């Protein structure tokens, strides 16, 4: 059996591998860059080796440095995780040459499936359904436009060595094909060191459904069911689930059989994933094969009861699979939400900074027979760096059925506290309660269709306003009673805490009276409605759980001056709790207007300016590219919002900018 595993990765996947290895009695070695000296995976491993500067090109994907770490520690096996070197055939070959076990598939399979053009040809020969397209390399932008026109728009422009949403663009016309070709080429070169591009037909309104395969070195290959990965943004998965709410048993069987056939065609062993796009008639087409463990593997583990990392280790050690295809059953439903360091209110742009607060919900069994799991690689006080992928954690919920899993996830998101960075928790909550998502009627266009103007938060309806008003009154009442008991203010004076309040949210006012009702508290509203409440706010707490109207409510609470900031279910409001008299006077107060930035192009994310496309005095049209910013390994194009004249260019290529720093100024 393997005795020591070096994990050629970082963050949550490194911690994930360490957890299984520890349970199996196998020692682990972490590697780390300058940016990760204090990282969780470094502390969790039995040993840790420094491998270089923060940029991944000089550390996590520097094969010679990984090999040096292997020699230094005497590791007899390497788990590559996902990303970085996980699908690098040269790395796997170097390990073979060094006599080190690669916990993954054979080199030949990595080569065959790692090239998107070759993989599609092999898939077609293996009888796997494929999408029409141009499988030869594209020379330049003009050829990209010509071929796209021949295939028929829309088309998907993709990096041959791509993955993770990088190096991919959808084009609907010749202009977008030319621009998309160059952007895909640049991203592919930066992310994978390989800028080869191909083009295929884009299937409109598709679902993204993938099949998990697992094979051993003795010729057995099985499939472990599917994962629904259609909730995507910019081709990057955000929410996954297993099984899919769309597949019927016949389609599931057919997809599984084709995935196994493809794996056998390349003599595959270890865990791998065959991705398909599926149209509304359940026709499915091969997309790509990922020759590694997927980010979203936990949902498969939760519904099958298997530990995929353990299976990978056992297969790498030469063991045969201990179960057959008929032994694989899907029990219940699992949902995964990816917590990203990104600002949903700024079009999901990357965010960096220190985690001043990181309190995930408790893992394990919950009420109603459900289960929570949180895979993470960070701790409170840790830093989210601009050098790596912005994923902070993967929160997973299992339930006996789909809605039970979704509701468990929704409550867990309510309880998840993250401060110090921008993050997508509010957006995840919004999706979980969206009726279209809950019904299972989803495609890869879900986010674009349901949030066409980006995410601006969830607007409270009348019922939500009542719940938030009740929370605000409960919090305010505790603070008032606490203040009333402070000694030494005025001698022989008994302060009476009022019971009648007016709660203001922006332009909405709600009259509320708080009353004791046995062991519960009753909030009566001015319109005659009422809510019973249970639960206590502890002064200084940033989160509180109540039962309001019979339903559990977990709210994040911040006291900011005279306001109580409440965040719940994607809503973010400031509540002002005042006496009726003060509320009447407050209506006459003037409101401060935000500064005018309409004549500035501000950097929407921390990153590096890679190109400036205009100069001072130039007239630009709406939608015209002005500059590009590279952040988190992604290239982002900044465009003109309207017709304008450039007054001043404030930066030059190579400049590192923080959020909201000026890029251009307009007349």
Question: How would you label these PLM feature ranges?
Answer:
Residues 593-667:
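Structured functional modules or segments
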Residues 516-522, 526-554, 562:
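Conserved nucleotide-binding/hydrolysis modules and their immediate coupling elements
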Residues 398-404, 409-419, 590-604, 608, ...:
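Conserved bacterial/organellar gene-expression machines centered on ribosome-associated P-loop NTPases
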Residues 259, 298-531, 622-625, 659-661, ...:
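Catalytic cores of soluble metabolic enzymes centered on carboxylation/carboxyl-transfer
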Residues 166, 243, 389-395, 597-599:
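Short amphipathic alpha-helical segments
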Residues 1-274, 278-297:
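N-terminal beta-alpha lobe that positions the nucleotide/phosphoryl donor
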Residues 552, 558-604:
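Catalytic P-loop NTP-binding/switch module of NTPases
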């Amino acid at each position: 059996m393997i005795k020591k595993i070096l994990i050629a990765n970082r963050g949550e996947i490194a911690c994930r591998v360490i957890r299984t290895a520890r349970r199996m009695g196998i020692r682990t070695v972490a590697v780390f860059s300058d940016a990760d000296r204090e990282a969780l995976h470094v502390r969790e491993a039995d040993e840790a080796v420094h491998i270089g500067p923060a940029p991944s090109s000089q550390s996590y994907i520097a094969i010679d440095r990984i090999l040096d770490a292997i020699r230094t520690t005497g590791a007899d096996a390497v788990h590559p995780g996902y990303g970085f070197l996980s699908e690098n055939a040269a790395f796997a070959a170097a390990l073979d040459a060094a006599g080190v076990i690669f916990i993954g598939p054979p080199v030949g399979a990595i080569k065959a499936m790692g090239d998107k053009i070759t993989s599609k040809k092999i898939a077609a020969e293996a009888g796997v359904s494929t999408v029409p397209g141009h499988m030869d390399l594209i020379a330049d932008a003009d050829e990209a436009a010509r071929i796209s026109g021949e295939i028929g728009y829309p088309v998907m422009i993709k990096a041959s060595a791509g993955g993770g949403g990088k190096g991919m663009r959808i084009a609907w016309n010749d202009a977008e094909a030319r621009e998309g070709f160059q952007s895909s080429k640049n991203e592919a070169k930066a992310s994978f060191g390989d800028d080869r591009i191909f083009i295929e037909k884009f299937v409109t309104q598709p679902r993204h459904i993938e099949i998990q395969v697992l094979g051993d070195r003795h010729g057995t290959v099985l499939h472990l069911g599917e994962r629904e990965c259609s909730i995507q943004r910019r081709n990057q998965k955000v929410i996954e689930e297993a099984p899919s709410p769309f597949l019927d048993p016949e389609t599931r069987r057919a997809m599984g059989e084709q995935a196994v056939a493809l794996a056998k065609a390349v003599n595959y062993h270890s865990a791998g994933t065959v991705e398909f796009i599926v149209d509304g008639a359940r026709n499915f087409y091969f997309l790509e094969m990922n020759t590694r463990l997927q980010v979203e593997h936990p949902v498969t583990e939760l519904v099958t009861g298997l530990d995929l990392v353990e299976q990978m280790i056992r297969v790498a050690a030469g063991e045969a699979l201990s179960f057959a295809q008929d032994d694989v059953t899907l029990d219940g439903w699992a949902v995964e939400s990816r917590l990203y360091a990104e600002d949903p209110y700024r079009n999901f742009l990357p965010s960096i900074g220190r985690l001043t607060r990181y309190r995930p919900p408790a893992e394990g069994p919950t009420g109603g027979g459900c289960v929570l799991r949180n895979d993470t690689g960070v701790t409170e006080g840790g830093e989210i760096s601009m050098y790596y992928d912005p994923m902070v954690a993967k929160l997973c919920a299992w339930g006996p059925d789909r809605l039970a899993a979704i509701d468990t996830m929704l409550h867990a998101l309510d309880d998840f506290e993250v401060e110090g960075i921008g993050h997508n928790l509010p957006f995840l909550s919004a999706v979980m309660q969206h009726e279209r998502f809950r019904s299972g009627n989803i495609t890869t266009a879900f986010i674009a269709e349901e949030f066409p103007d980006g995410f601006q938060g969830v607007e409270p309806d009348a019922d939500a306003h009542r719940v938030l008003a009740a929370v605000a009154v409960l919090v305010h009442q505790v603070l008032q009673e606490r203040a009333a008991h402070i000694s030494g203010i005025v001698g022989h004076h008994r302060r009476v805490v009022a019971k009648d309040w007016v709660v203001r949210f922006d332009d909405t006012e709600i009259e509320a009276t708080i009353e004791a009702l046995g062991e519960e508290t009753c909030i009566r509203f001015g319109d005659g409605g009422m809510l019973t409440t249970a639960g206590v706010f502890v002064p200084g707490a940033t989160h509180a759980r109540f039962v309001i109207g019979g339903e559990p409510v977990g709210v994040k609470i911040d006291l900011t001056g005279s306001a109580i900031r409440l965040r719940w279910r994607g809503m973010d409001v400031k509540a002002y709790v005042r006496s009726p008299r003060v509320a009447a006077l407050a209506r006459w107060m003037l409101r401060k207007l935000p500064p005018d930035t309409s004549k500035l192009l501000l950097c929407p994310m921390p990153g590096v300016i890679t190109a400036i496309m205009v100069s001072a005095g130039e007239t630009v049209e709406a939608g015209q590219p002005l500059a590009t910013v590279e952040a988190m390994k992604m290239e982002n194009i900044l465009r003109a919002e309207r017709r304008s004249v450039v007054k001043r260019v404030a930066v030059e290529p190579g400049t590192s900018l923080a959020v909201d720093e000026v890029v251009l100024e307009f007349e």
